[in-house]
Amino acid sequence: MSAQAQMRAMLDQLMGTSRDGDTTRQRIKFSDDRVCKSHLLNCCPHDVLSGTRMDLGECLKVHDLALRADYEIASKEQDFFFELDAMDHLQSFIADCDRRTEVSKKRLAETQEEISAEVAAKAERVHELNEEIGKLLAKVEQLGAEGNVEESQKVMDEVEKARAKKREAEEVYRNSMPASSFQQQKLRVCEVCSAYLGLHDNDRRLADHFGGKLHLGFIEIREKLEELKRVVAEKQEKRNQERLKRREEREREEREKLRRSRSHSKNPKRSRSREHRRHRSRSMSRERKRRTRSKSREKRHRHRSRSSSRSRSRSHQRSRHSSRDRSRERSKRRSSKERFRDQDLASRDRDRSSRDRSPRDRDRKDKKRSYESANGRSEDRRSSEEREAGEI
């Protein structure tokens, strides 16, 4: 794989399928059945054991780091229960490994039938010491790589003690067996990875086995399987509790409904009176609301009528005042006209009297004065009538 491809894979693992903003780049979703659920949980045996002596090859399902990143983001908001599928996958794989281990043990047991139980126990002791030394040496290498020199020195002291115990156990085992059978009985099966181990292998070889990728890969798979079992058991327990809680709630509701129906059937009068009281209270509340609405409407109507009557009275008063003013103006004009007319007539009469002093003229003047006085009275009567009409 080139450096560019490695960088692209790292970006997919960190940011998911839509790292470039293109959502159509990846048509398959992580929830698809074609996607390996063990790969999404980072525990697929095809990935863990790749490059070892038990390499399983390429997985039949889809493996994509971007899909794993999408699943990690989505699993924070929703539980997809992919742990169950991964647990089934790992269980089948570990069961196959345990089956191979049992077969290898049976093959070794067929060649070791003549060995007594005491000799077998001594051989078991030698093998246990070999495993202990190998694990301690692998730990020493790990501590040295981390730079923890003091801890690695302490572990090396334990390794030396285990080596001394191993030499003693080998001496006891060698003395308890004949020389011919001692050379034949030198193999043992590893309980973790089902690989063959020699009873007389040196420490370096044992350390390489226990610190190797195959053995550590099987340890990782077995630990992941135990973790998945625990997680699945917790989730199933939680789901069972929720289901039981919902069932109890349904049963409680059903009991409550049954109790209510029984109480209604036992006391129909009480239920009727209850219904009657409810209906009555509802009707009373409706009546109160209706009254309040009608009162508010009446208040609004009164207010409007008062305002309209006030406006009408004001307009009527204004019209009355205006009519009075107009009538007064008219009367003033008429009185001034009559005054001028009387003065004019008086001046004319004086002139005529001075000119005509005959009795005939006097009679005519008297008739004329009587006629003009009658006309003045009629005009006064008309002005008074017009004044009254204006006031009305």
From Swiss-Prot:
Keywords: Coiled coil, Hydroxylation, Nucleus, Phosphoprotein. InterPro entries: Luc7-rel (IPR004882). One of its GO terms (biological process) is mRNA splice site recognition. It is found in: Nucleus speckle; Nucleus, Nucleoplasm. Residues 258-321 have a biased composition (Basic residues). Residues 235-257, 337-364, 377-392 have a biased composition (Basic and acidic residues). The modification 5-hydroxylysine is found at K266, K269. It comes from the Eukaryota. One of its GO terms (cellular component) is U1 snRNP. The modification Phosphoserine is found at S18. Belongs to the Luc7 family. May bind to RNA via its Arg/Ser-rich domain. Interacts with SCNM1. This is Putative RNA-binding protein Luc7-like 2. It comes from Mus musculus (Mouse).
